[in-house]
Amino acid sequence: MCSGPRKPSTPPLPQQQKEATVMAASLLLELAAADDVAAVRRVVEEEKVSLGVAGLWYGPSASGVARLGMERRTAAMVAALYGSTGVLGYVVAAAPAEAARASETDGATPLHMAAAGGAANAVAATRLLLAAGASVDALSASGLRAGDLLPRATAAEKAIRLLLKSPAVSPSSSPKKSASPPSPPPPQEAKKEYPPDLTLPDLKSGLFSTDEFRMYSFKVKPCSRAYSHDWTECPFVHPGENARRRDPRRYSYSCVPCPEFRKGGSCRKGDACEYAHGVFECWLHPAQYRTRLCKDEVGCARRICFFAHKPDELRAVNPSAVSVGMQPTVSSPRSSPPNGLDMAAAAAAMMSPAWPSSPASRLKTALGARELDFDLEMLALDQYQQKLFDKVSGAPSPRASWGAAANGLATASPARAVPDYTDLLGSVDPAMLSQLHALSLKQAGDMPAYSSMADTTQMHMPTSPMVGGANTAFGLDHSMAKAIMSSRASAFAKRSQSFIDRGGRAPAARSLMSPATTGAPSILSDWGSPDGKLDWGVQGDELHKLRKSASFAFRGQSAMPVATHAAAAEPDVSWVNSLVKDGHAAGDIFAQWPEQEQMVA
């Protein structure tokens, strides 16, 4: 049998070699995720699997969008993603270049994976990569840095962010030697760097992220730390800080920016200014904070965002209640209407510093002194009238107290005289009403009697017990009460003069009384009470009826005295002849009744 040279063994096919590489890479990635350092070392040293081999791995992407997908990853990337510090330390020690290798699909580095993973050991993995020379400025295929992929509201977020900002971090992981001298860096503003401070609170979580804290405490309360730290990371205010805010609950100011502060950075009014000083006072004001949606919505990366990121985070603000709570409230008396404010309280409210800070007064000019005096006078008049109405309503009926009133008036001292409420109801002194009765039955031109009656009214009103007591009970002095009463007395004088003029035009009115009737003064004087004295402690509606009965006395003078008083003389019926002879005059009297009723009513 012939024998020839032995043929060499057939080399493995490229397809088989590719499949073996894929299997080895998948095994290495699984071991890196499980942080099995011994198995990884055996695969690398015995099976000669390269640490730089990449395989497909299902996980987060470095594109900035919260999505999962199949991406090519190395062992260092997977170890950084899951916080496998044992495998990661072995990889960066055996191959330091793996700390800065970028993925072929999305351009992610192990530092991107450590930031996006949010693992429990993410902080330790970040330190290992930074110590191995990983670049914090490396960009992914989407143009994002590692700090842009940090998940929000996690325990490791702040610590990793501080590590990425630390000045000890090398800006580049692959320093290349060059023959030419390095070009000087472009001039930048000097920014003071602070060492990482884990004691500072997280501005995006817990109490410091609530609306109540941001509106009323953020950059309002002073900081208690006695050492130098980063003011931008601290929610409290520091001496000389531009972000200082006034407490909206202590200072009354709006969310409108101050024009003077915007121009020069200062305001002459200081804390007394009614406008917002700075961006924080403007946008963190309770009337504006989170009343609009943020344009970035849930993808917003700002530390302190003034806007709402979801529709349910929007705050509903009532414009009339914004200066809520910021204006002093003035309570009116229980028995007075809403416009019957107390004079002292109303004046104090108008003169208080918080008065011009209301939304209406910020947009309108202040009231003039003349308008203010007029408003105060009207408030005093309304209050005084309401108080007197309440007083009259609570008084006993005259029919029930005629006997008691007769005894009381006989024994009472002048200091306890019956109050005079005639200023309220459009009438005056009781003697005036009796004289008015007599005037309706006498000659029309008796002016001196009315003049003396008006003098009595002017003398009586300032010394009335009600007016004198108003100084202490209702907050009115004698001068104000006299001014109010004088206007009513002048109006009544004009009305009484019209009564006299109308009576002068009725010649038949003078013939209605007989001589016997005229000579009986008790018939005219005791129409209000049995003892001939007026009792003014009556109800408001009863006094109104008495006034109306006085105006209609013309109607009943021919029959009332004869019917009620038996001791009077026989009536003179000669008035019938006058009515028959002068029909026009009688018609004139009856025509005057509706006019008198309208005048009194």
From Swiss-Prot:
Fetch the InterPro entries from UniProt: Ankyrin_rpt (IPR002110), Ankyrin_rpt-contain_sf (IPR036770), Unkempt-like (IPR045234), Znf_CCCH (IPR000571)
**Start and stop residues of the ANK repeats:** 71-101, 106-138
Coiled coil, from the record = none
The organism's superkingdom is given as Eukaryota
In residue numbers, the zinc fingers (C3H1-type) are 252-280, 288-312
Q: Which GO terms describe its biological process?
A: regulation of gene expression
The GO terms describing molecular function are:
DNA binding; zinc ion binding
Question: Which UniProt keyword terms apply here?
Answer: ANK repeat, DNA-binding, Metal-binding, Repeat, Zinc, Zinc-finger
Q: Region labeled Disordered — which residues?
A: 167-203
Low complexity: bias regions = 167-180
Protein's name in the database: Zinc finger CCCH domain-containing protein 33
- Originating species: Oryza sativa subsp. japonica
Taxonomic classification: Eukaryota, Viridiplantae, Streptophyta, Embryophyta, Tracheophyta
